[in-house]
């Protein structure tokens, strides 16, 4: 599934293409996609395909096409502080992007059938937290993953504001999925080969919208034990954050506000006025035409009166542009102002590193 947009050279170019094709339509979703490099969730030997609009599967590891994830993120209408359940959470790529929008007071849970995939997802999550240049720009709702079949979730589990299922849902399981939602909640899932958005408008009232045609592998049916009983999946508890954790969130938030105020004071509106460099135009001095006549091929050139002096003209044009245009300089590497501020605080080093989530940069 995929191939709806052109491949990108890097993550940003892929996002540009998804925006141009109207798969990404809102700023929050765009920011989340740009913050997490899709290639980081690929095995090293397959990273050359990371920026293509194609699904990828290797063993139990699977990623949907970027255009599908874009539609899912837009349809979920995510907001800070909501609770999210990802059924078939896989590599954790989608859950991590969702966590950037939910913020520190959201709930971010995932259920994955394969334990090896959960280990893979935890490794990728740890890598993102430790090394990403984008992590400190957001307040992150870290996802929690449990192993199990999403069709065996305990009936006394909490309901969620947003639910996504990453496998094809059979019609017989539609009601089961809908019951995972709070009133006012949104469920997005592949149903009868259509990516479907279902909004719970009341205790027994629903609105359904078909988004686009998709092809997903169907949900794997539960395997019952010898006693005939299914193994109920217990979702992670919705725990209250510790006072220490709340203090870290508050301190980081205060520092971010100070940085923002300093930026506004320094740059007026907070936006840097970066110089624009004029690109040198390449002028074509001649045109070649090829004519097919029966089996013969004829080539001709339409000359320009300035052909004879083309080299001199181009050299003169180059010199003029060099005089007018200031030399281009490489952009400075991004500065993590939050990290700088924290490290400058009169605090013990262990506390500083706690405030920085023990990140490497």
From Swiss-Prot:
<feature type="region of interest" description="AdoMet binding motif">
    <location>
        <begin position="181"/>
        <end position="191"/>
    </location>
</feature>
<comment type="function">
    <text>May act as a substrate recognition component of an ECS (Elongin BC-CUL5-SOCS-box protein) E3 ubiquitin ligase complex which mediates the ubiquitination and subsequent proteasomal degradation of target proteins. May bind to the methyltransferase cofactor S-adenosylmethionine (AdoMet) via the N-terminal AdoMet binding motif, but probably does not display methyltransferase activity.</text>
</comment>
<dbReference type="GO" id="GO:0036211">
    <property type="term" value="P:protein modification process"/>
</dbReference>
<dbReference type="InterPro" id="IPR000682">
    <property type="entry name" value="PCMT"/>
</dbReference>
<dbReference type="GO" id="GO:0004719">
    <property type="term" value="F:protein-L-isoaspartate (D-aspartate) O-methyltransferase activity"/>
</dbReference>
<feature type="compositionally biased region" description="Acidic residues">
    <location>
        <begin position="309"/>
        <end position="320"/>
    </location>
</feature>
<keyword id="KW-0963">Cytoplasm</keyword>
<dbReference type="GO" id="GO:0005737">
    <property type="term" value="C:cytoplasm"/>
</dbReference>
<feature type="region of interest" description="CUL-box">
    <location>
        <begin position="345"/>
        <end position="348"/>
    </location>
</feature>
<feature type="region of interest" description="Disordered">
    <location>
        <begin position="303"/>
        <end position="336"/>
    </location>
</feature>
<dbReference type="Pfam" id="PF01135">
    <property type="entry name" value="PCMT"/>
</dbReference>
<feature type="active site">
    <location>
        <position position="64"/>
    </location>
</feature>
<feature type="region of interest" description="AdoMet binding motif">
    <location>
        <begin position="85"/>
        <end position="94"/>
    </location>
</feature>
<feature type="region of interest" description="AdoMet binding motif">
    <location>
        <begin position="160"/>
        <end position="164"/>
    </location>
</feature>
<keyword id="KW-0449">Lipoprotein</keyword>
<feature type="lipid moiety-binding region" description="N-myristoyl glycine">
    <location>
        <position position="2"/>
    </location>
</feature>
<dbReference type="InterPro" id="IPR029063">
    <property type="entry name" value="SAM-dependent_MTases_sf"/>
</dbReference>
<feature type="region of interest" description="BC-box">
    <location>
        <begin position="240"/>
        <end position="250"/>
    </location>
</feature>
<protein>
    <recommendedName>
        <fullName>Protein-L-isoaspartate O-methyltransferase domain-containing protein 2</fullName>
    </recommendedName>
</protein>
<keyword id="KW-0519">Myristate</keyword>
<feature type="compositionally biased region" description="Basic and acidic residues">
    <location>
        <begin position="321"/>
        <end position="331"/>
    </location>
</feature>
<comment type="similarity">
    <text>Belongs to the methyltransferase superfamily. L-isoaspartyl/D-aspartyl protein methyltransferase family.</text>
</comment>
């Amino acid at each position: 599934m995929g191939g709806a947009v052109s491949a990108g050279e890097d993550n940003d170019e892929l996002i540009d293409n998804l925006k141009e094709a109207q798969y990404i339509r809102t700023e929050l979703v765009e920011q989340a996609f740009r913050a997490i490099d899709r290639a980081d969730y690929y095995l090293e030997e397959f990273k050359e395909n990371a920026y293509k609009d194609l699904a990828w599967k290797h063993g139990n590891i699977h990623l949907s096409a970027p255009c599908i994830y874009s539609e899912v993120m837009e349809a979920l209408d995510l907001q800070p502080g909501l609770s999210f359940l990802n059924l078939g959470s896989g590599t954790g790529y989608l859950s991590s992007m969702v966590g950037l929008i939910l913020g520190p007071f959201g709930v971010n849970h995932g259920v994955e059938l394969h334990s090896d995939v959960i280990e893979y997802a935890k490794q990728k999550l740890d890598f993102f937290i430790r090394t990403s240049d984008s992590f400190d720009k957001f307040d992150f709702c870290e996802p929690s993953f449990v192993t199990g079949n999403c069709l065996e979730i305990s009936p006394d589990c909490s309901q969620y504001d947003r639910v996504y299922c990453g496998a094809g849902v059979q019609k017989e399981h539609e009601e089961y999925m809908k019951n995972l939602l709070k009133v006012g909640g949104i469920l997005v899932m592949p149903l009868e080969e259509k990516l479907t958005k279902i909004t719970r408008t009341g205790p027994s009232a629903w609105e359904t919208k078909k988004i686009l045609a998709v092809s997903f592998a169907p949900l794997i049916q539960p395997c019952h034990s010898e006693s005939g009983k299914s193994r109920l999946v217990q979702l992670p508890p919705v725990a209250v954050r510790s006072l220490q954790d709340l203090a870290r969130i508050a301190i980081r938030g205060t520092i971010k506000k100070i940085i923002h105020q300093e930026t506004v004071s320094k740059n007026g509106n907070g936006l840097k006025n970066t110089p624009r460099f004029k690109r040198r135009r390449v002028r074509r001095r001649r045109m070649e035409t090829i004519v097919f006549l029966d089996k013969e091929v004829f080539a001709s050139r339409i000359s320009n009166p300035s052909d004879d002096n083309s080299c001199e003209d181009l050299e003169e044009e180059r010199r003029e542009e060099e005089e007018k245009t200031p030399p281009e300089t490489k952009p400075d590497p991004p500065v993590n102002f939050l990290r700088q501020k924290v490290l400058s605080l009169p605090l013990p080093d262990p506390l500083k590193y706690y405030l920085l989530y023990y990140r490497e940069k």
